[in-house]
Structure formats: structure tokens, C-alpha cells
């Protein structure tokens, strides 16, 4: 039995859109962040059939939080099967975004174990622009698609000052961008 209040058919439709890189279908009005968080594990299972591969923070920009009426960032789930390796070659997907991130591995109690560079590929396209709400962002898992973790360093040995020296290279059609 589900512990959420959203229609199963809605989760099926969203999962299909995510898996096929299509626009998210029109969503019912008034989906709360709380309802979306309750439904999110059920969506992840529909998308991948496997367990989450980790957590992701989203809407970390305070201006966007204010626009969406939030006081803190949102959390989503990374798909375990979506972990990719350096040098990944992907087909073009209209609207896909590339986000440079920091990956942090946590132990079971949530304490940081290691940290390193990460790249997240995000694909989120609402068919109805007005559907861009905090609850709907959570419900659609904030566009989680693929992610790449770089070399991880033990948390207590990481020099956070080196972050200004990180270089990322994107190659598109054989050209460095």
C-alpha cells in the first residue's frame, strides 16, 4: 500500500516522461512539497526499478528559493543505475542541462566520509510552464538524469581552497567548449 496521496497513474505518466526524455505531462494544481516527498520513492522505483544511488540537493540558489516560496533547498534522489564514468558519450537531448557540483559520500548516520567533483546531467521540461512549483520539482525528482563522480578525497583531508583550481572540459562534436 502506498503512503502517499497522489494517483498512481500520475506517477506512471511522470516516470514514462523521465525515462523517455519527454516533457512532463500537465500536473494537477496544488501538489505540496510534503506530498511530493512522500511519493518520490515510488517514482524512483518506477523510473529505474532499483534503489536510490544517493541524494541530491536542488534549488540551492537563495533567489530561486525566494521565487518558489522556499526557505531551504530541496532534496531529490540520484538513480543508482544512472551513475556514469568519466568520458561518457551521450546522445543529444533537447533541454538537458549540465551542472558542476560537489559530490559528498555520507555514512549511515549522515556524516561526511569523502568529497570530490561531480557532474550532474539534468533534464526537466514541464509541458505547462506554470507547473514549475516547489512541489512539482520534488515530484519530478528535480530532473535527475545522469551523474558522474570524480576522484573522491577523504573529508578530513580535502583542501576546500583548491576548489578555485578545478577545471572542467566539455567536448561537443569534437570541439572543446
Regions picked out by a protein language model, each given a short descriptive name:
Residues 3-177:
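Catalytic-core "active-site belt" of small-molecule-metabolizing enzymes
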Amino acid at each position: 500500500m502506498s503512503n502517499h496521496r497522489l494517483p498512481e497513474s500520475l506517477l506512471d505518466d511522470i516516470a514514462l516522461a523521465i525515462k523517455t526524455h519527454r516533457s512532463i505531462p500537465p500536473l494537477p494544481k496544488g501538489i505540496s512539497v510534503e506530498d511530493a516527498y512522500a511519493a518520490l520513492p515510488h517514482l524512483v522505483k518506477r523510473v529505474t526499478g532499483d534503489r536510490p544511488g544517493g541524494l541530491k540537493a536542488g534549488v540551492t540558489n537563495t533567489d530561486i528559493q525566494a521565487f518558489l516560496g522556499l526557505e531551504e533547498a530541496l532534496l531529490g534522489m540520484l538513480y543508482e543505475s544512472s551513475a556514469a564514468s568519466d568520458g561518457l558519450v551521450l546522445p543529444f537531448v533537447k533541454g538537458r542541462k549540465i551542472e558542476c557540483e560537489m559530490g559528498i559520500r555520507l555514512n549511515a548516520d549522515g556524516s561526511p566520509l569523502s568529497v570530490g567533483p561531480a557532474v550532474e546531467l539534468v533534464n526537466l521540461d514541464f509541458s505547462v510552464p506554470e507547473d514549475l512549483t516547489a512541489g512539482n520539482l520534488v515530484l519530478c525528482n528535480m530532473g535527475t538524469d545522469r551523474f558522474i563522480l570524480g576522484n573522491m578525497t577523504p573529508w578530513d583531508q580535502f583542501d576546500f581552497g583548491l576548489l578555485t583550481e578545478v577545471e572542467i572540459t566539455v567536448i561537443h562534436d569534437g570541439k572543446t567548449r
